[in-house]
Amino acid sequence: MNTKYIFSVFQLSLLFVFSSCCDKNSCQNEKKSSKLTQQSIIDAASSDTSAVRQSLVRINSTIQIWSASQPWDKSAPKKRRALGALLEGNRVLTTAEMAADATYIELENADNTRIIPAKVVAIDYEANLALLEPDNGDTDSFFKDLKPLRLGSSAKIGDRVDVWQLEDNGMPIVTDAVIQSVDIVSSFANGHFFLTYEAKGSMQSASNSFTVPVIRNGKLLGLLSSYDSKDQIIDIIAPEIIQAFIADTSDGDYVGFPSLGIGISSTVDPNFRDWLKLSDDLGGLYVTKIRKDSAAQKAGLEKGDVIININDKAIGRRGYYTDQQYGRLYWSHLIRGSLKQGDTLELTILRGGEQKQIMATLTRPEEPLVARDTYDQAPVYLIKGGLIFQELTATYLKAFGKDWQAKAPLNLLDIMMTPEDYEKDRNKIVFLSAVIPTPATTGYERLRNFIINKVNGQTIADISTLIDAFKKPGTDGLHTIEFAE
């Protein structure tokens, strides 16, 4: 500390000696130059600060998730905070993670002086995107002096981007990052993969942890979906996905990203390739499943077909193709990243050793037998005589914990893995989830996770048919419940 002080005094003394040696004009010029340089830095800093503060909106959400074991109840409320990107029309773009299962959402300006309640305009759990807008309140006052961001174009590997953050006190933080790779990533709803930039940058810890905007050349490039502080890797939802999402909301009726509706496996194994009659110059994906009423089924695709081309893009043995801009990408981007519902694509397949062309019109998948994403939806259940009946969902199975695929009941897991074996005469799977201890249920307390086939002789397709069946007891007034084997 003393050394630093002495050195500072020595510097000041030296500066005084040199300054006394210059003439009046040169001293004035140096002072003027110094003043201009300092003013330029201040102006630039003010400009950057203004851009961040004027285009970012704080988002505060209260989240409550429905209980799987007690479907009439909710978990304790949790708070989430994030930064959203202000768009044209006083709308705010954020991730679905900030809006899913939210009981209350509010918008707050950068300096914490104005707050307004918000509502969800559109949400896509699969792509992890949500669009918010004010819900009553003084809209004009809230958005006064704020400037919307324009959507930017796609980037390439090596491009530099800025990650915008705000401290609690409103001070902006701008982190420089470099795009290192592009991949297809699932960021929120499991099993749904979308185009994602992976950038390298050391982000500072700030109050907004769930998502922040990423900027390139003054325009919105994407939204942060995750950050690995150890490896300093930032996952960014790509602009193509955001643009498709925004375009779909323009008519007020959000549809969502299309699906082909198939299950696939790779064709790497040489013995498997010989059996499929695949030559060495062909890649290909083996079709293992065709979803009921899907675009693939309507187009005539069959289980056992091998997809070797999609819209003239050769599909490799592991499912990758060469994208003109990004290089090697997984085949799903050809469906969910560059096309919309109603678009037609051409599939070149190998069936029995012969190549065929199939045209498929993309659609949204129908509600599956076992619903995978039940965000913002209360569990469908019925309590009758102390017996709790539910419709099976992936949410229920995941409630068994981190290792749910090993801990959940095997009979219910089998339904999720092979729903086609259970679809006959069913819209949903109804099962007995638990028994409430009462005098009437004595001896039945351990009954749980049994699939319901019939009640009072009526086949059970969903909860609504279960309710109808219980209205028709036997002549003795008793109800008969038949479980699946």
Language-model features and meaning:
Residues 18-20:
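C-terminal motif of bacterial Sec signal peptides marking the signal peptidase cleavage site
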Residues 27-86, 92-98, 104, 128, ...:
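N-terminal activation segment of mature serine protease catalytic domains
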Residues 36, 40-49, 220-279, 320, ...:
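C-terminal cap/linker of serine protease catalytic domains
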Residues 55-60, 135-148, 173-236, 280-288, ...:
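Active-site region of chymotrypsin-like
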Residues 75, 203-213, 265-309, 313-316, ...:
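PDZ/PDZ-like domain segments forming the peptide/carboxylate-binding groove
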Residues 88-173, 203-204, 357:
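Conserved active-site neighborhood of the chymotrypsin/trypsin-like protease fold
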Residues 98-101, 298, 309-348, 454-484:
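PDZ domains, with a preference for the canonical peptide-binding region formed by the helix
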Residues 122, 141-196, 205, 226-235, ...:
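Flexible, gly/ser-rich surface segments that form the specificity/activation loops bordering the active-site cleft
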